[in-house]
Structure formats: structure tokens, C-alpha cells
A protein has these predicted regions:
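S-adenosyl-L-methionine
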Residues: 1-35, 39-40
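Conserved S-adenosyl-L-methionine
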Residues: 25-85
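Short, solvent-exposed loop/turn segments at secondary-structure junctions
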Residues: 37-40, 56-59, 149-152, 208-211, ...
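SAM-dependent nucleic-acid methyltransferase catalytic core
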Residues: 1-7, 11-15, 70-223, 227-232, ...
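Long, positively charged, glycine-interspersed low-complexity recognition regions
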Residues: 229-231, 236-320
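Short active-site oxyanion
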Residues: 26-30, 48-49, 196-202, 252-258
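Short loop/helix-cap segments at secondary-structure boundaries that form the rim of catalytic
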Residues: 41-46, 214-217, 267-274
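Conserved beta-strand scaffold positions in the cores of enzyme catalytic domains, especially
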Residues: 50-52, 203, 277-279
Length: 320
């Protein structure tokens, strides 16, 4: 079991074992629709066809960089943690402007091809491409620091905490290994993967209805952890009431299996009353400072019997 490399709003660290134990007994494609920090993905056993998706492009860019450019990512992080609110605010302002690569790159390349010799153009193209790639890395490192040093991993308010650098880098390397761990895909699977060939977890940046339509099949298993009802403003990507209804409509029509985690409230219970609903209670990690021992109630919703996997496991015989 591998830990996620970042904390995250609504992360499933405390629920991951409960959830994994209730996966369907059989499926051949695993898709995380609202990937977030990927706590469930990192905790589950690697499988041959896995997809990490999130509508937040900062998250998916960071996952892509950790998977494909870990050395550059670690180098960009450096050994200098943020020590003040002023440093955090400066980085937050820079990140919001999304100024991570050279402006007018396409126009520059077109003009260079006209006015430079072939040899000079190749050298110039390599330089520009390298700088653009570093822009992705810089963006990923900045986003990582914002999440790591913000209150409740929200990325908006400073909450500096001591950092174990060795442990941080070890977690990043383990994440890199996990994202590259599963099997090489066949030509047909690469086509289904949306043109993402090769070994490892497929990383996508799409809306939930698009990603579900792309991968749905009778043997696909979707795990979904959407913004919880009533807490949508805590997330960078807006999730409206209409989207909660749309998610229910989409899930009601799929061919595959789904597992959905939500906060326990009457609205969600009524919305998904036609499916299996399993309650779960965990420590409320955000409120522990003010209400020690406070609990948070959640729901696990599935379109299959969530006890099937548990029932299918062999029971240990005893002589007592």
C-alpha cells in the first residue's frame, strides 16, 4: 500500500481499506473519476488497466509530471520549504496567473522555421521545447507547495508545518513507481485510453460525464468521490447542484459498476435511494483541534452488492 504524495480536501486516507474491501469481485478496467489525491488508487493493488481523472488541470499536470519527469520535479521542489505567509501569498499569486511557459510559443516556432537555417531551427526548437516542459514542471512544483503548506490542503490560506524532506521525496518516488507499475496495454486498449500508450496509469483531465462515456463497459469499475453536497465552494473546480443531479442521471445509465462516496445527508440518500447505500463513520480530521474525537458520517453508494467480495473470500477454519 502506497500513500498519496499530497493531502487533499476530502481525501480518502481513513476510508481506503473499507472501500477497497467492497470493490466488485470482477472487473478489468478501473477508473477514478474524481481522482483528487488518489488515496484509493495508491492503496489498491496495481491492475492492468487503470485511469486517474480529475477536472482540475493543476492536479492532473502534477500527476503527469510525477509519472514522467520525477527527477525534474524533485529538482524544482528544491530544499527550501515556505517559512512565511508572505512567501506563500507570493507563490499563490504567481500560480493563479498560470504564467509557466513562454508566451506566443506557436508563433515563435513558425517564424523561426521561416527565418532560421534548418540546423539553427532544430537547436532553437529543442531550446523552446525544453523550456515549455520545464514550465509544466514548475507549475507542478508550485501547486504541490501550495497544497502542502495550506490549511486543510485547500491551497488558499497559509498554514506552515514542519516538513520531513527525506519522507517527502520518498513518497514522491513511491508515487512515481506506482503510476508506472501496471501492465503494458494492447493496441485496442491504447485506443480506448484516448491515445495514451505505454505502461502505467492513464492520466486524464476531463469532466465526469465525458470520462464515464469514454470508458464505460460491462467490465469497467468506476470509483467516484465528487465534491460533497454543501461543501462545493471548498474546491477549485465549481460543482453546482445541477451537476449533482447530472451525476445521478449518468450513473443510472452506465453498463459498468460504480462505487460512489458522499457525505451522509437526506438529499443524497433520497437522490440515490434506488441503489445500495452503506453508511460509514470516521474521525473528522479537520475538526480534531477544536472537537477532539469528532466524527464525520459518510455514505458508500454502489450499483452492486458491496458485500459480494467479502462473501466470496474464503473463511478461515478453526477448531474452537
Amino acid at each position: 500500500m502506497v500513500n498519496s504524495m499530497i493531502p487533499w480536501i476530502g481525501g480518502k486516507r481513513l476510508m481506503r481499506e473499507f472501500l477497497i474491501a467492497r470493490f466488485p469481485p470482477y472487473y478489468d478496467k478501473y477508473v477514478e473519476v474524481f481522482g483528487g489525491a488518489g488515496w484509493v488508487l495508491f492503496a489498491k493493488k496495481p491492475e492492468r488497466f487503470e485511469v486517474y481523472n480529475d477536472a482540475n488541470s493543476n492536479l492532473t499536470n502534477m500527476f503527469h509530471v510525477v509519472k514522467h519527469k520525477p527527477m525534474s520535479f524533485v529538482k524544482e521542489l528544491g530544499f527550501l520549504p515556505l517559512n512565511s505567509r508572505a512567501e506563500f501569498d507570493l507563490m499563490l499569486d504567481w500560480h493563479r496567473k498560470q504564467d509557466f511557459s513562454l508566451p506566443y510559443q506557436t508563433e515563435e516556432m513558425a517564424l523561426a522555421k521561416i527565418y532560421l537555417s534548418p540546423i539553427d531551427f532544430r537547436e532553437y526548437k529543442e531550446l523552446i521545447t525544453t523550456q515549455a516542459e520545464l514550465g509544466d514542471v514548475r507549475r507542478a512544483a508550485t501547486f504541490y507547495k501550495l497544497i502542502r503548506y495550506s490549511y486543510a490542503a485547500g491551497g488558499n490560506s497559509f498554514n506552515g508545518q514542519p516538513v520531513n524532506i527525506a519522507q517527502t521525496y520518498r513518497t514522491i518516488w513511491l508515487a512515481n513507481r506506482r503510476l508506472n507499475e501496471n501492465g503494458v496495454k494492447s493496441d485496442s486498449e491504447i485506443l480506448m485510453a484516448g491515445g495514451n500508450p505505454g505502461k502505467g496509469v492513464i492520466i486524464q483531465n476531463k469532466s465526469f460525464e465525458v470520462i464515464i462515456a469514454l470508458y464505460d463497459s460491462p467490465t469497467t469499475f468506476f470509483y467516484l468521490d465528487p465534491p460533497y453536497f454543501g461543501t462545493e465552494k471548498q474546491y477549485e473546480e465549481l460543482f453546482t447542484l445541477e451537476l449533482h443531479y447530472l451525476l445521478r442521471e449518468v450513473l443510472g445509465k452506465i453498463e459498468g459498476f460504480f462505487m460512489l462516496s458522499y457525505n451522509d445527508c437526506e438529499f443524497i440518500r433520497e437522490l440515490y435511494k434506488d441503489f445500495y447505500i452503506t453508511p460509514f463513520e470516521r474521525l473528522n480530521s479537520i475538526s480534531q483541534k477544536y472537537t477532539p474525537g469528532g466524527m464525520f458520517k459518510e455514505l458508500v453508494i454502489t450499483n452492486y452488492d458491496p458485500e459480494l467480495r467479502l462473501k466470496s473470500q474464503p473463511k478461515q477454519l478453526t477448531l474452537l
